[in-house]
Amino acid sequence: DADRLAIVDEKGEPLGEEYTIVIAADGYLDELQQSEKFVINLSSSLALEKLAEQKNSTVLRSAVGEINVVKKMNEINSNIGGEGNGGVILRECHLGRDSLVAVTLILNRMSQSTDKLSEIYSSLPQFKIVKDKVNVDNINSEEIIKKATSLFENAEKNTIDGVKFTWDDRWVHLRKSNTEPIMRIYAEAP
């Protein structure tokens, strides 16, 4: 349904779906020339937060799902948001993920300099993310989350959607799927 965008650079290298919103935001902030509030979900990359810090902007997190991102955008009157799945939401167009909006924002960023897409990407904060899932058909996923919470006592915890453990430059997010008998596990670090 053309709501997400995956990017490939001029060398044929995929940049990763997590960086669609980051590159779009980079150009958006440079064009705007003022601070902005972004909304992304809990499972999205830290790269946007680190970029926002560099550009005097903020990032707020929502539960996973387009509807949750949009609700948070409305709550804080944010103009731009998205998810680390290639989805970008721009209020001035409409409050839904849209790959054509993402394409426009990416092309806007590319037009702001003579840098190649690979150079734009490499200038951004770099993180590696792992996304996995575990079958929990006969396992109490709440018990898994409870046990994990006791293991990571030194981390900041967010429980709006499963549990996310965050340190300065890394995080782990555990959440039960709403559609399958699985637990999704996401982790990111430099």
Give, region by region, the residue ranges found by the protein language model.
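Short Gly/Thr/Asp-enriched flexible loops that form oxyanion-binding sites at enzyme active sites
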Residues: R4-I21, L48-E49
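Short, acidic/small-residue loops that bind anionic groups at enzyme active sites
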Residues: P14-S35, A63-G65
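Phosphate-binding and adjacent anionic-ligand microenvironments
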Residues: E31-P190
